[in-house]
Amino acid sequence: MQKIRKGDKVVMLAGKDKGRTGEVVQVMPKEDRAVVRGVNVVKRHQRQTQTQEAGIINKEAPVHLSNIAIVDKDGKPTRVGFKVVDGKKVRVAKRSGEVIDG
């Protein structure tokens, strides 16, 4: 079970976008990376294809999972733990102890 999943609201802990929040769009567990909406936006030079024009586009680049943390109810970053509730393994916010919906 992953600590950070698609749809989670996260905050950047390091890098040029430190402190900014966004929603996880994609998680790549094999590379330990995630794509976060509106964070780590880079410019890509797009080659022309039959469907797309050439030009410079803005795109979210993946960030390492160690540089992001889930946002707790009070808006501050929290670590994630696991607990068994009613026979199911669920994610729990270490800061508040609340179950993270997922």
UniProtKB/Swiss-Prot annotation:
Pfam families: KOW (PF00467), ribosomal_L24 (PF17136). GO terms for cellular component: ribonucleoprotein complex; ribosome. Coiled coil: none annotated. GO terms for biological process: translation. InterPro entries: KOW, Rib_uL2_dom2, Ribosomal_uL24, Ribosomal_uL24_KOW, Translation_prot_SH3-like_sf. GO terms for molecular function: rRNA binding; structural constituent of ribosome. Keywords: Ribonucleoprotein, Ribosomal protein, RNA-binding, rRNA-binding. Part of the 50S ribosomal subunit. One of two assembly initiator proteins, it binds directly to the 5'-end of the 23S rRNA, where it nucleates assembly of the 50S subunit. Belongs to the universal ribosomal protein uL24 family. This is Large ribosomal subunit protein uL24. It comes from Rhizobium etli (strain ATCC 51251 / DSM 11541 / JCM 21823 / NBRC 15573 / CFN 42). The gene is rplX.
